[in-house]
């Protein structure tokens, strides 16, 4: 017996049967071992018996019983599974005869299945005959699956029913109601139909950005074929979506991938144009399966595409089409391009309205129309790195999923009460052990409290269950309507007019009426009482999801946030002392943005802060970041002194192609792409190279910039703050009593205009002059720094108080108008914090003690009280 005459699957089956015999401690490999392996591991054997309508469960039981009857030989030196039984040897010889009769080149699985029908006194043969299965029926099933093919290679079983194995029948999926409806895209579908109707080169390729609906167009064509809304030439055709991944997966041996693809193409060719092959991500066929000396999938398709034997529809993105298909000119010319543009917001709303019912049925929720409009408009405005309608559909889907999860989870109010009951029950069990009067009194009170909580929990639970049941009932009725509509469509397509009339005028209206009654009843209950569960998806839910994805707050203002925004200026005044104009302008810009009346095409605000060092320019940016985001992490700080050379400018938007760091992206663009809602602080802009400002022109004017990767980065939700020391000497010399005169402002502006180009300055919203700090301002800053020190010491449970004399002395000693507030910090560190630290380390100041800091003869004194 020559094993080379067997297909690889048969060889593997014999090897697995041998392993089974060894594991079972059987001396010989029997027919039962082989068929046990075939029925568990061979898809082909299972498929043959399915087509022949064999009860495989009963067959497997017979095989198990046969294996149990084989005697187990134990002991040392016994060779298990080293020989074939006489019955198996006979089966192999009969299989070779079957191979010769069918004129095949190799013995394959089907020959074993046929050969077992001729075995005498074999339990498997007896069981098949008991099921009234003759060899003729099994042979017919095999020939049906083979589809006229012969076994010409050792991978023959892999190539039977290749389209079923490696593809999905989209038309069958439409008929079974698995695909979502396709709304719009009529022009593109008509274009595809026109190309498919050509004599040669009838292969459209859909090209568009990811998420614009390329695959949906093919699904729309499948739906039209089912509705017979296509020209005569396309009626009754089938669209098979080819899965390149499963075609390549598991092709271990050289030439196996080509054989599989050849089998697919052969089946398409034999269909005489009845099968349209749809290859999603068609760029994957270029180079697919290419190994040393092998031909890739693209080259195998070319001859059939050119002759018009293969109707192929491709879909790929613009970038991948350019990268893969355009490079292969011979392949490109065999396809006709169909460009799929991104739909408008209005078209997206229509698409969402078409999908609304499907989402409602799947999630069991009720979607408001304003939620669909919000999903289209908010995704278009805030999610700029993805495309409509995909991003809008994802928003609606996630909002529905959020509501569904809340419906299925235990409500937080009920959860709290249930936990309280559990806590009281534990306490009750502990108190029952105690016998003293106080414990008994406490137990009595606790039991009354527990009874109240249990009653409340039971009421809430029953209310939750009833609300959940109502929602489930509505969902079931919606599913029923969807099922009936699908039946109606099927009846109309099959011209079953009696059934169609019964559905259209009888069953569907009755179920729709039931749904309306249930929804009305639900609304009535909602109006009358507070409901635990919410099943409505409104624009607020959509806005929440947008906020979660992007970090941009787009929800309607809640009361707490209104207060926070209205008091923003006051809070900033406390953090940044002495710069009232700057604080007011910045807080007004944030207020306009959050109220939704800012220009949607520009950043929230762009400012240049001018002033001497240490007056609060950077501090204001930090305070704003902390107030808007509760942390300074959302502040993107870029020190412009790092961008003094011409070549360093490209670091902002990313290195150009061919340079190191190209893949990493720019320092500014990547930071904003990750956090689109943030404060961008460009510190010391006068130190940057002039070319930096050319990059900033588009950011300030249109709120957008393209990075080195070609991605559009959105700056429309950023506050851009630039700081500079230009004109600080004039501000220091000529500021009188903390006020800046109009003449001084004009002189500073002239210096600024000589430093920066007019087109840059013209795009900035406001140029704010920071005044040098007065002694009164410095006293206010001392208060702030002392408060910060008190917060730091609170961790060690030490409280400090500083007398007014000491504070005034610190302000006078550390005040220097040239350096602003920074010397103040240094003075406090040197004269207050360092002596304090020495006292703490030496053990003179212990935790839980108070320290009074006073002034005596221009020296600080520390009085410690426990």
Swiss-Prot record:
Binding site for ATP 1: 208-215
PROSITE patterns, per database record: CLP_R, CLPAB_1, CLPAB_2
Superkingdom per UniProt: Bacteria
Gene Ontology biological-process annotations: cellular response to heat; protein refolding
Positions of region (Repeat 1): 6-70
Keyword tRNA-binding: no
Coiled-coil annotated residue ranges, if any: 393-527
Pfam families (UniProt xref): AAA, AAA_2, AAA_lid_9, Clp_N, ClpB_D2-small
Ranges for region Repeat 2: 84-148
Region (NBD1): 161-342
Principal cellular location given in the protein's record: cytoplasm
A GO molecular-function annotation: ATP hydrolysis activity
Ranges where the Clp R domain occurs: 3-148
Alphabetically ordered keywords of this record: ATP-binding, Chaperone, Coiled coil, Cytoplasm, Nucleotide-binding, Repeat, Stress response
Subcellular location: Cytoplasm
Keyword Cell inner membrane: no
Region (Linker): 343-551
Region (C-terminal): 773-866
Chain intervals for the UniProt region annotation (NBD2): 561-772
InterPro entries: AAA+_ATPase, ATPase_AAA_core, Chaperonin_ClpB, Clp_ATPase_C, Clp_N_dom_sf, Clp_R_dom, ClpA/B, ClpA/B_CS1
Function: Part of a stress-induced multi-chaperone system, it is involved in the recovery of the cell from heat-induced damage, in cooperation with DnaK, DnaJ and GrpE. Acts before DnaK, in the processing of protein aggregates. Protein binding stimulates the ATPase activity; ATP hydrolysis unfolds the denatured protein aggregates, which probably helps expose new hydrophobic binding sites on the surface of ClpB-bound aggregates, contributing to the solubilization and refolding of denatured protein aggregates by DnaK.
Domain-related comment: The Clp repeat (R) domain probably functions as a substrate-discriminating domain, recruiting aggregated proteins to the ClpB hexamer and/or stabilizing bound proteins. The NBD2 domain is responsible for oligomerization, whereas the NBD1 domain stabilizes the hexamer probably in an ATP-dependent manner. The movement of the coiled-coil domain is essential for ClpB ability to rescue proteins from an aggregated state, probably by pulling apart large aggregated proteins, which are bound between the coiled-coils motifs of adjacent ClpB subunits in the functional hexamer.
Similarity field: Belongs to the ClpA/ClpB family.
Name of this chain's protein: Chaperone protein ClpB
Species whose genome carries this gene: Listeria monocytogenes serotype 1/2a (strain 10403S)
Gene expressing this chain: clpB
């Amino acid at each position: 017996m020559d094993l080379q005459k067997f297909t690889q699957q048969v060889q593997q089956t014999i090897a697995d049967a041998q392993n089974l015999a060894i594991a079972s401690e059987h001396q010989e490999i029997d027919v039962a071992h082989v068929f046990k392996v075939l029925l568990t591991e061979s898809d082909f054997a299972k498929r043959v018996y399915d087509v022949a309508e064999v009860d495989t469960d009963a067959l497997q039981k017979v095989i198990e019983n046969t294996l149990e009857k084989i005697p187990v030989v134990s002991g040392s030196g016994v060779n298990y599974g080293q020989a074939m039984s006489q019955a198996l040897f006979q089966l192999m010889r009969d299989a070779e005869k079957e191979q010769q009769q069918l004129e095949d080149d190799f013995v394959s699985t089907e020959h074993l299945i046929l050969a077992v029908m001729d075995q005498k006194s074999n339990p498997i043969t007896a069981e098949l005959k008991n099921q009234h299965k003759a060899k003729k029926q099994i042979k017919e099933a095999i020939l049906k699956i083979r589809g006229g093919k012969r076994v010409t290679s050792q991978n023959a079983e892999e190539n039977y029913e290749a389209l079923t194995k490696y593809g999905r029948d989209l038309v069958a999926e439409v008929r079974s109601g698995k695909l979502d409806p396709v709304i719009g895209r009529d022009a593109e579908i008509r274009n595809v139909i026109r190309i498919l109707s050509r004599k040669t080169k009838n292969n459209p390729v859909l090209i568009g950005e990811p998420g614009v609906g390329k695959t949906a167009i093919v699904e729309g064509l499948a739906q039209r074929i089912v509705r017979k809304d296509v020209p005569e030439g396309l009626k009754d055709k089938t669209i098979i979506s080819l899965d390149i991944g499963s075609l390549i997966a598991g092709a271990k041996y050289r030439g196996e991938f080509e054989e599989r693809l050849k089998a697919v193409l052969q089946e398409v060719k034999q269909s005489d144009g009845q099968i349209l092959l749809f290859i999603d991500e068609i760029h994957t066929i270029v180079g697919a399966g290419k190994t040393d000396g092998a031909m890739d999938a693209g080259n195998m398709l070319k001859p059939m595409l050119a002759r018009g034997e293969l109707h192929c529809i491709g879909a790929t993105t613009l970038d991948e089409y350019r990268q893969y298909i355009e490079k292969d000119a011979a392949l490109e010319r065999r396809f006709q391009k169909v460009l799929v543009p991104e739909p408008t917001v209005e078209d997206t709303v229509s698409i969402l309205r078409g999908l609304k019912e499907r989402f409602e049925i799947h999630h069991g929720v009720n979607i408001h129309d304003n939620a669909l409009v919000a999903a289209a408009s908010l995704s278009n405005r805030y999610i700029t790195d993805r495309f409509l309608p995909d991003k809008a559909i994802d928003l609606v889907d996630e909002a529905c999923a959020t509501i569904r999860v809340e419906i299925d989870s235990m409500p937080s109010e009920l959860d709290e009460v249930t936990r309280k009951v559990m806590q009281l029950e534990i306490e009750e069990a502990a108190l029952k052990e105690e016998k003293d009067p106080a414990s008994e009194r406490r137990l009595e009170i606790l039991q009354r409290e527990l009874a109240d909580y249990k009653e409340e929990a039971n009421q809430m639970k029953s209310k939750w269950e009833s609300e959940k049941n109502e929602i489930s009932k509505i969902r079931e009725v919606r599913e029923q309507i969807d099922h009936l509509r699908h039946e109606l469509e099927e009846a109309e397509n099959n011209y079953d007019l009696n059934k169609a009339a019964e559905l259209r005028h009888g069953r569907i209206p009755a179920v729709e009426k039931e749904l309306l009654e249930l929804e009305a009843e639900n609304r009535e209950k909602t109006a009358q009482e507070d409901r635990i569960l919410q099943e409505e998806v409104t624009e607020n839910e959509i806005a929440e999801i947008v906020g979660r994805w992007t970090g941009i707050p787009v929800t309607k203002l809640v009361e707490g946030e209104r207060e926070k925004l209205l008091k923003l200026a006051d809070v900033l005044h406390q953090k940044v002392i002495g710069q009232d104009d700057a604080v007011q302008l910045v807080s007004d810009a944030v207020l306009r943005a959050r109220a939704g009346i800012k220009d949607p095409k520009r950043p929230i605000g762009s400012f240049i802060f001018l002033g001497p060092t240490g007056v609060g320019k950077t501090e204001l940016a930090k305070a704003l970041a902390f107030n808007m985001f509760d942390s300074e992490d959302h502040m993107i700080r870029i020190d412009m002194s790092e961008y003094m050379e011409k070549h360093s400018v490209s670091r902002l938007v990313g290195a150009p192609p061919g340079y190191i760091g190209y893949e990493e992206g720019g320092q500014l663009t990547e930071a904003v792409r990750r956090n689109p809602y943030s404060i961008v602080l460009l510190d010391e802009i006068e130190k940057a190279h002039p070319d930096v400002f050319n990059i900033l022109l588009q950011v300030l004017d249109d709120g957008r910039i393209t990075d080195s990767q070609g991605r559009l980065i959105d700056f429309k939700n950023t506050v851009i703050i630039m700081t500079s020391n230009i004109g600080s000497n004039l501000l220091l010399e000529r500021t009188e009593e903390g006020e800046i005169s109009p003449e001084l402002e004009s002189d500073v502006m002239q210096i600024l205009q000589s430093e920066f180009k007019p087109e840059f300055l013209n795009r900035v919203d406001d140029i704010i002059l920071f005044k040098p700090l007065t002694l009164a301002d410095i006293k206010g800053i001392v208060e702030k720094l002392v408060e910060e020190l008190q917060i730091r010491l609170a961790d060690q449970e030490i409280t400090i108080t500083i007398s007014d004399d000491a504070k005034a002395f610190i302000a006078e000693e550390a005040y220097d108008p040239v350096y602003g507030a920074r010397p103040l910090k240094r003075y406090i560190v040197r004269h207050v914090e360092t002596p304090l630290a020495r006292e703490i380390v030496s053990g003179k100041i212990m935790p839980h003690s108070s320290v009074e800091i006073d002034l005596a003869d221009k020296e600080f004194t520390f009085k410690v009280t426990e």
